[in-house]
From Swiss-Prot:
This is UPF0179 protein Mboo_1959. Belongs to the UPF0179 family. It comes from the Archaea. It comes from Methanoregula boonei (strain DSM 21154 / JCM 14090 / 6A8). Pfam families: UPF0179. Transmembrane segments: none annotated. HAMAP family: UPF0179.
Protein backbone atom coordinates (compact mmCIF):
# COMPACT_ATOMS: atom_id res chain seq x y z
CA UNK A 1 0.00 0.00 0.00
CA UNK A 2 1.33 3.47 -0.89
CA UNK A 3 2.49 5.77 1.86
CA UNK A 4 0.24 8.66 2.75
CA UNK A 5 1.52 12.08 1.66
CA UNK A 6 2.43 14.60 4.32
CA UNK A 7 0.73 17.96 4.71
CA UNK A 8 2.03 21.11 6.39
CA UNK A 9 -0.25 22.58 9.06
CA UNK A 10 -0.01 24.48 12.34
CA UNK A 11 -0.56 22.98 15.80
CA UNK A 12 -0.14 24.27 19.32
CA UNK A 13 3.56 24.54 20.13
CA UNK A 14 3.15 22.31 23.20
CA UNK A 15 1.82 19.52 20.94
CA UNK A 16 4.46 19.96 18.23
CA UNK A 17 6.51 16.80 18.77
CA UNK A 18 7.22 14.05 16.23
CA UNK A 19 4.96 11.06 16.84
CA UNK A 20 2.19 13.02 18.56
CA UNK A 21 -1.24 12.03 17.27
CA UNK A 22 -4.36 14.15 17.32
CA UNK A 23 -7.86 14.24 15.87
CA UNK A 24 -8.55 17.44 13.95
CA UNK A 25 -11.77 18.95 15.33
CA UNK A 26 -12.16 21.90 12.96
CA UNK A 27 -11.85 25.65 13.15
CA UNK A 28 -12.43 27.50 16.42
CA UNK A 29 -14.39 30.78 16.53
CA UNK A 30 -11.17 32.50 17.67
CA UNK A 31 -9.66 31.69 14.25
CA UNK A 32 -12.09 33.95 12.39
CA UNK A 33 -9.78 36.97 12.21
CA UNK A 34 -6.43 35.14 12.09
CA UNK A 35 -4.27 35.86 9.04
CA UNK A 36 -2.83 32.31 8.96
CA UNK A 37 -6.06 30.38 9.63
CA UNK A 38 -5.86 28.60 6.27
CA UNK A 39 -2.57 27.02 7.33
CA UNK A 40 -4.16 25.66 10.53
CA UNK A 41 -7.48 24.60 9.11
CA UNK A 42 -6.35 22.57 6.12
CA UNK A 43 -7.04 19.09 7.52
CA UNK A 44 -10.10 16.82 7.36
CA UNK A 45 -12.40 17.23 10.35
CA UNK A 46 -12.65 14.10 12.50
CA UNK A 47 -9.54 12.43 11.04
CA UNK A 48 -6.54 11.27 13.08
CA UNK A 49 -3.12 12.71 12.22
CA UNK A 50 0.44 11.95 13.30
CA UNK A 51 3.14 14.63 13.43
CA UNK A 52 6.11 13.55 11.32
CA UNK A 53 8.37 16.63 11.34
CA UNK A 54 8.43 19.87 13.32
CA UNK A 55 9.44 22.98 11.40
CA UNK A 56 10.95 26.17 12.80
CA UNK A 57 8.06 28.46 11.79
CA UNK A 58 6.13 29.83 14.78
CA UNK A 59 3.05 32.10 14.96
CA UNK A 60 1.12 33.81 17.72
CA UNK A 61 -2.22 32.12 18.25
CA UNK A 62 -5.47 33.06 19.99
CA UNK A 63 -6.29 29.38 20.58
CA UNK A 64 -2.96 27.97 21.79
CA UNK A 65 -1.37 29.58 24.84
CA UNK A 66 2.23 29.27 23.60
CA UNK A 67 1.43 29.95 19.95
CA UNK A 68 1.37 27.61 16.97
CA UNK A 69 4.22 25.83 15.23
CA UNK A 70 4.37 24.51 11.67
CA UNK A 71 4.51 20.72 11.39
CA UNK A 72 4.29 18.07 8.71
CA UNK A 73 1.54 15.53 9.39
CA UNK A 74 0.16 12.43 7.77
CA UNK A 75 -3.13 10.68 8.36
CA UNK A 76 -2.51 8.07 11.03
CA UNK A 77 -3.88 4.54 10.99
CA UNK A 78 -6.67 3.79 13.44
CA UNK A 79 -7.25 0.51 15.28
CA UNK A 80 -10.87 -0.56 15.46
CA UNK A 81 -13.22 -3.54 15.61
CA UNK A 82 -15.19 -4.41 12.49
CA UNK A 83 -17.35 -7.29 11.37
CA UNK A 84 -15.19 -10.37 10.78
CA UNK A 85 -16.52 -10.81 7.24
CA UNK A 86 -15.16 -7.35 6.27
CA UNK A 87 -11.71 -7.90 7.82
CA UNK A 88 -9.62 -8.58 4.73
CA UNK A 89 -6.32 -6.81 4.12
CA UNK A 90 -6.54 -4.13 1.38
CA UNK A 91 -10.33 -4.29 1.24
CA UNK A 92 -12.27 -1.02 1.19
CA UNK A 93 -14.93 -0.58 3.83
CA UNK A 94 -17.49 2.10 4.56
CA UNK A 95 -17.60 2.67 8.30
CA UNK A 96 -21.03 2.52 9.90
CA UNK A 97 -21.39 2.72 13.66
CA UNK A 98 -24.20 0.30 14.42
CA UNK A 99 -23.76 -0.08 18.17
CA UNK A 100 -24.64 2.47 20.83
CA UNK A 101 -23.79 0.37 23.91
CA UNK A 102 -21.58 2.93 25.63
CA UNK A 103 -21.19 0.66 28.67
CA UNK A 104 -19.51 -2.05 26.54
CA UNK A 105 -15.79 -2.53 27.23
CA UNK A 106 -15.11 -2.55 23.48
CA UNK A 107 -17.11 0.60 22.71
CA UNK A 108 -14.01 2.76 22.14
CA UNK A 109 -12.72 0.21 19.61
CA UNK A 110 -16.06 -0.03 17.80
CA UNK A 111 -16.36 3.77 17.63
CA UNK A 112 -12.78 5.07 17.79
CA UNK A 113 -11.81 8.72 17.66
CA UNK A 114 -10.37 9.63 14.27
CA UNK A 115 -12.86 7.61 12.20
CA UNK A 116 -15.69 9.41 10.42
CA UNK A 117 -18.92 7.47 9.99
CA UNK A 118 -19.92 7.06 6.35
CA UNK A 119 -16.39 7.53 5.00
CA UNK A 120 -14.40 4.85 3.20
CA UNK A 121 -11.28 3.27 4.63
CA UNK A 122 -8.84 0.54 3.62
CA UNK A 123 -8.11 -2.36 5.96
CA UNK A 124 -4.33 -2.10 6.30
CA UNK A 125 -3.88 -5.02 8.69
CA UNK A 126 -5.91 -7.63 10.53
CA UNK A 127 -4.59 -7.75 14.08
CA UNK A 128 -6.71 -10.60 15.41
CA UNK A 129 -9.97 -11.42 17.12
CA UNK A 130 -11.81 -9.10 19.48
CA UNK A 131 -10.60 -9.55 23.05
CA UNK A 132 -14.16 -9.44 24.42
CA UNK A 133 -17.39 -11.08 23.28
CA UNK A 134 -19.66 -8.64 21.47
CA UNK A 135 -22.80 -7.83 23.45
CA UNK A 136 -24.78 -7.89 20.21
CA UNK A 137 -23.44 -11.34 19.32
CA UNK A 138 -21.41 -10.17 16.33
CA UNK A 139 -18.14 -11.81 15.25
CA UNK A 140 -15.57 -9.00 15.32
CA UNK A 141 -11.96 -8.62 14.25
CA UNK A 142 -9.43 -6.04 15.40
CA UNK A 143 -8.03 -4.22 12.38
CA UNK A 144 -5.91 -1.23 11.47
CA UNK A 145 -7.55 1.06 8.92
CA UNK A 146 -6.42 4.04 6.83
CA UNK A 147 -8.50 6.51 4.82
CA UNK A 148 -9.20 5.22 1.30
Amino acid sequence: MAETKTKVTLVGTVLAKPGTEFVYEGESPECETCKVKKACNNLNRGHRYRIITVRSTHHDCAVHLNGATAVEVMEAPVTMLISADMAMINSKIKVEFSCNKTECRSYSLCRPDGVVEGEKYVVADVLGNASDICGKGRALKLVEIRPA
